[in-house]
């Protein structure tokens, strides 16, 4: 199609993409709209076998009446939608939104993929949002359907446009929001398969960044009604956008976006992580939560997304901060998905007097015939960490590990999450959180208790106490003969370089075996203590679980030692 002419207030319409001219050909892309606030045309549909849909035309740019440096008139035009694919064909990509100083245009949606049959097809990718004071939204990914033997894959959501001083656009890798909001992520496309192939939900867009970050988009769902080796997987979701307030005189709130939910499918998609939130100011801070895992209709549930971190760098900050909560693991027909870890909380200023508490871990999803999901441990006090989270407080307030998530239910009980760790570089106490208890098995063995979070005071002049978390109790065994109780979690390690006390967590109790010849779980090991100039108090090992009829009691856990 021809390019539309420029105009003072509205550009000409972009030409429509033509039909494909040969077998296996492709529809031509729609041409760009002229300068102004007009939309690009949509691509034409593929009309023959294996004909792909044409791409949507790009939206026109906002016209500058007084020259390139003058005020612009109108927002950028919207991108055209991608055309639908013909039989076996792929959907066309959505056109990008036009750029304009007042606001970028919205990206077009991806076209729907044709029946994939034996060759496979995909939905088109959503168009990216245009750049402007406020970024344009990214388009949604196209859907795809299959009745044959090949795969059907939903298209990815489009990226959000950059907001130079205002709002970031919706979509993956959204633009910076300046002083405004980041846009939400574009959703992934849905995939449906009635044949023997796979169905893959499309990936979602990420949220845009801003003082208020945009939420990640939801992953595309996948539905598989066929037979054979068909295993549909829900699309993973987008992460939440970051949020930053770099002005120490500001009282604004920094709110990062939440992660999107994983798509449902034969296997559930994973949830997106919450966005990171940072402030030099004295206003509030709200870290985004992790997205939940998708449901697995015949397989496993998706993993919950991690909570976003919260970082404060102003001693006058008075609102008690906390990292974002981890997302819930998705339920599964076989295994439940693991819960997401809680976000960290970090206080950088030595003048601060408030506590830093890590975010809570998400609960594990429920399983059917398989194992329940493992609960995600919260990250404590400030920094990042694997398993149990790391927390950092450089002020006089306490560093506290985040609460862990519970294990999911299942034939075999889910393991409890590990307690969040805590680090104090200032003069405050450090307290690791207790590990979560393992979940009882409905028919099988009980889940293992989570380990207690470690605690560290790392200031040689400090008299503060480091307290390791208590290990979680093991879950009881289920109804089937020989289903043993779960083991107790280990007590958290405690260490101080100052003259205070290092008090260590005790090991968790082993779960009971309730069925015939079932053995009780082993008690958790008591934590070790390290305090060269202070007072070390090692943890006591956990008691072993009680046996079922004809079984044996579980052994007690070993006591901790001074190291």
Residues covered by each model-derived region:
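Collagen triple-helix signature
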Residues: 1-563
């Amino acid at each position: 199609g021809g390019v539309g002419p420029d105009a003072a207030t509205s550009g000409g319409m972009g030409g429509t993409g033509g039909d494909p001219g040969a077998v296996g050909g492709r529809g031509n892309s729609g041409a760009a709209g002229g300068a102004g606030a007009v939309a690009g045309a949509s691509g034409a549909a593929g009309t023959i076998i294996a004909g792909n849909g044409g791409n949507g035309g790009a939206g026109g740019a906002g016209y500058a009446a007084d020259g390139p440096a003058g005020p612009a008139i109108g927002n950028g035009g919207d991108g055209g939608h991608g055309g639908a694919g013909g039989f076996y064909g792929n959907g066309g990509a959505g056109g990008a939104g036009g750029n304009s100083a007042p606001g970028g245009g919205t990206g077009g949606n991806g076209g729907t993929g044709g029946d994939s049959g034996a060759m496979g097809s995909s939905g088109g990718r959503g168009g990216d949002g245009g750049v402007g004071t406020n970024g344009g939204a990214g388009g949604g990914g196209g859907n795809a359907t299959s009745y044959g033997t090949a795969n059907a894959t939903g298209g990815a959501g489009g990226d959000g446009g950059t907001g130079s001083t205002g709002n970031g656009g919706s979509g993956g890798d959204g633009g910076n929001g300046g002083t405004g909001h980041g846009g939400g992520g574009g959703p992934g496309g849905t995939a449906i398969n009635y044949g023997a192939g796979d169905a893959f939900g499309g990936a979602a867009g990420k949220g845009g960044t801003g003082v208020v970050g945009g939420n990640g988009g939801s992953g595309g769902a996948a539905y598989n009604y066929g037979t054979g080796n068909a295993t549909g997987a829900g699309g993973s979701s987008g992460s939440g956008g970051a949020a930053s307030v770099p002005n120490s005189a500001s009282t604004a709130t920094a709110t990062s976006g939440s992660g999107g939910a994983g798509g449902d499918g034969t296997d559930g998609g994973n949830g997106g992580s919450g966005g990171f939130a940072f402030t030099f100011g004295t206003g509030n801070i709200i870290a985004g939560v992790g997205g939940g895992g998708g449901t697995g209709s015949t397989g496993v549930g998706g993993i919950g997304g991690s909570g976003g971190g919260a970082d404060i760098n102003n001693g006058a900050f008075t609102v008690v901060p906390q990292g974002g909560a981890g997302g819930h693991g998705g339920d599964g027909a076989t295994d439940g998905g693991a819960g997401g870890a809680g976000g960290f909380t970090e206080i950088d200023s030595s003048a601060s007097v408030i506590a830093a508490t890590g975010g809570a871990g998400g609960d594990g999803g429920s399983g059917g015939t398989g194992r329940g999901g493992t609960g995600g441990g919260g990250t404590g006090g400030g920094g990042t960490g694997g398993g149990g989270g790391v927390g950092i407080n450089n002020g006089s307030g306490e560093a506290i590990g985040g609460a862990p998530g519970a294990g999911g239910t299942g034939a075999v009980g889910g393991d409890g999450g590990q307690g969040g760790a805590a680090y104090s570089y200032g003069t405050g106490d450090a307290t690791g959180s207790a590990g979560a208890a393992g979940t009882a098995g409905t028919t099988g063995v009980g889940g293992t208790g989570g380990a207690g979070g470690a605690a560290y005071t790392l200031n040689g002049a400090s008299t503060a106490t480091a307290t390791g978390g208590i290990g979680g109790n093991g879950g009881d065994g289920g109804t089937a003969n020989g289903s043993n109780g779960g083991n107790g979690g280990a007590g958290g390690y405690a260490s101080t370089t100052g003259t205070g006390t290092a008090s260590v967590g005790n090991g968790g109790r082993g779960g009971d075996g309730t069925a015939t010849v079932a053995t009780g779980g082993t008690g958790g090991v008591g934590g070790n203590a390290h305090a060269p100039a202070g007072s070390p108090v090692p943890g006591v090992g956990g008691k072993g679980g009680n046996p079922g009829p004809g079984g044996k009691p579980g052994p007690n856990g070993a006591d901790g030692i001074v190291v």
